[in-house]
Amino acid sequence: MIPNFLIPFFRTNHAGETGAVFIYKGILKLSKDKDIISFSKRHLITEADHLRTIERLLPKKYHSKLINLWKVMGFITGYIPSLMGKNFIYATIFAVESFVERHYQEQIKILSDKKEYKELTCLLYTS
């Protein structure tokens, strides 16, 4: 279970992981590049797993209320770079993942001295 003080973070995590799933769906909808397709399929599986984990931990009443918006925005974030090619796709993924890493590091820092949340901290390290 997620402590109350982390619920706002995990609501954001829920939105972000949903967006990530749809980024890869957007890429896969358009890209014909076999390396990009392989890369995107692998990452889609990983992001879908992260999303399932967050949905399991975060009570449904705290899930993002704008979930459909995050799906559309994620899809667009993957689809548009696909119009411009492999380098744009990788640059987009790098930018998104850099932001996510900073977001999760903020949560890890908050939890780092709280031994009772060690499992949650480990989860954030692997997301």
Task: Give a label for each model feature.
Residues 1-12, 32-35, 58-61, 114:
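Terminal targeting/low-complexity segments that flank the catalytic cores of oxidoreductases
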Residues 6, 36, 62-66, 86-89, ...:
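Residue-level recognition of alpha-helical structural elements
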Residues 30-38, 106-121:
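Inter-helical turn/loop segments and adjacent helix faces that build the functional surface
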Residues 37-71:
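Conserved alpha-helical segments that form or flank metal/cofactor-binding pockets of metalloenzymes
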Residues 67, 71-78, 82:
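Short hydrophobic helices that act as membrane-entry/anchoring signals
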Residues 125-126:
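Conserved small/polar residues in nucleotide/adenosyl-binding loops
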